[in-house]
From Swiss-Prot:
Topology within the bilayer: Peripheral membrane protein
GO cellular component terms, semicolon-separated: plasma membrane
Similarity-based family: Belongs to the ABC transporter superfamily. Aliphatic sulfonates importer (TC 3.A.1.17.2) family.
Localization (cell): Cell inner membrane
Name the UniProt record assigns to this protein: Aliphatic sulfonates import ATP-binding protein SsuB
Lineage: Bacteria, Pseudomonadati, Pseudomonadota, Gammaproteobacteria, Enterobacterales
Amino acid sequence: MNTARLNQGTPLLLNAVSKHYAENIVLNQLDLHIPAGQFVAVVGRSGGGKSTLLHLLAGLETPTAGDVLAGTTPLAEIQDDTRMMFQDARLLPWKSVIDNVGLGLKGQWRDAARRALAAAGLENRAGEWPAALSGGQKQRVALARALIHRPGLLLLDEPLGALDALTRLEMQDLIVSLWQQHGFTVLLVTHDVSEAVAMADRVLLIEEGKISLDLTVDIPRPRRLGSVRLAELEAEVLQRVMRRGHSEQLIRRHG
């Protein structure tokens, strides 16, 4: 693990990144810079390239063209600093909660696993089986499993999409709190625009493989649900998502 990034997160730089599947162009010469420790949400219609972007950053796929860098280093060279959460928590049902958190680790890892579970609010469920947990609790285990590695980059692919509304809000608060404590870089893919503006520093809209909106969320934390400014930003993003025409021009809003 690269300890130099533990307190500041992984900076990301994508230069002219494209991803093709035969004749289907999913990402089209995408350029993106994300400073270390920034919380970025990515929204857009299905098939626009959101999850493909996360898969490239996670090393699950390779770009057809372009460079994916952590600062000046190819991201693939420091993949151990990256962790990813999915909508399905992907817990092994035959292993206890604490064993799922420590999956793949060697040596004296149980104390670290207990600390990670405590940070995720599940310290009292360490010895239980995944089948005994609710959907939200399973995602807390998945979050603890990511935290134990002290990642520089946390990738979130719709991890809250299957949760009920109250549990979803609780998980949003937990993820933001842990991000503030640990300083890792976060990329969240979500179809929920309200979730994006509530959690992120910055919201990107990907359309037809390109970034068509790059919006700074200029709201102090903690953010109050139902605030006028949150509603205005949500409406701005939704208006862009729902519009009929597609412009190639990048729209930026700062401050």
